[in-house]
A protein has these predicted regions:
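Juxtamembrane "helix exit" motif at the C-terminal ends of alpha-helical transmembrane segments
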Residues: 72-93, 156-175
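Hydrophobic transmembrane alpha-helix segments characteristic of membrane transport
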Residues: 112-135
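Alpha-helical transmembrane segments of polytopic integral membrane proteins
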Residues: 16, 25-29, 83, 120-124, ...
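Hydrophobic, lipid-facing residues on alpha-helical transmembrane segments of integral membrane proteins
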Residues: 60, 64-72, 98, 102-114, ...
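Membrane-interface segments at loop-to-transmembrane junctions
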Residues: 56, 130-147
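Conserved small/polar residues in nucleotide/adenosyl-binding loops
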Residues: 179-181
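Transmembrane alpha-helix/interfacial motif
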Residues: 4-34, 59-77, 104-114
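Membrane-interface amphipathic/juxtamembrane segments adjacent to transmembrane helices
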Residues: 25-59
Length: 181
């Protein structure tokens, strides 16, 4: 099997996942009942149930827009050699395969995080505010984003370093070492 075949399989799986998730989200939103299900009548009054339903549907729309943008950007990155450009850049900064891999994934992570901020902001300060769920201030929002970025970066760097070390250490037979983990 050629690299091009793997690329097309990967693209097909990404598109399938997007379509499958979008259809499921649509079907879930479409099948919300206006009347409270009997199992929930003890927990919700009609007004709160309708509020929860509308909130969920509105958040789903933002999620769909975000997912669509992610798909378009991912496909554009593949088509226009964006991932290769990032890889070449990472390679130019270090001779260490571990550092190169960490730089590559951190650039992708930063890019993804920055693209997600407007959607997160809208969800928090527009949608949650509309339904009375928002208790977040702009200062808290910014602090949470910075903390989340730092924590996720530490995790990404740690896992990437470990994975690349194992692959590099065991070379061609690295997958055999995974059986023993």
């Amino acid at each position: 099997m050629t690299a091009e075949n793997f690329l097309w399989i990967f693209i097909g799986l990404v598109i399938f996942n997007f379509v499958f998730t979008t259809v499921l989200e649509y079907l879930n939103d479409k099948n919300w009942k206006n009347d409270i299900p009997n199992d929930l009548k003890d927990f919700y009054n009609a007004e709160n149930y309708l509020k929860a339903k509308n909130y969920k549907i509105e958040r789903g729309r933002i999620s769909s827009i975000s997912s669509s943008l992610s798909l378009i950007i991912s496909l554009a990155m593949l088509y226009f050699y964006g991932f290769g450009f990032i890889s070449d850049y990472a390679i130019s900064l270090s001779d260490s395969i571990i550092i190169q891999s960490c730089i590559f994934f951190m650039i992708l992570h930063l890019f993804t995080h920055i693209l997600g901020i407007p959607f997160s902001y809208y969800s928090t300060f527009i949608i949650e505010e509309k339904y009375g769920f928002n208790k977040t201030t702009l200062k808290t929002f910014i602090a949470d984003n910075i903390k989340g970025l730092i924590i996720s970066s530490v995790i990404i760097i740690g896992l990437t370093s470990l994975a690349v070390f194992v692959i590099d250490f065991f070379s061609a037979g690295y997958w055999l070492s995974l059986i023993h983990i």
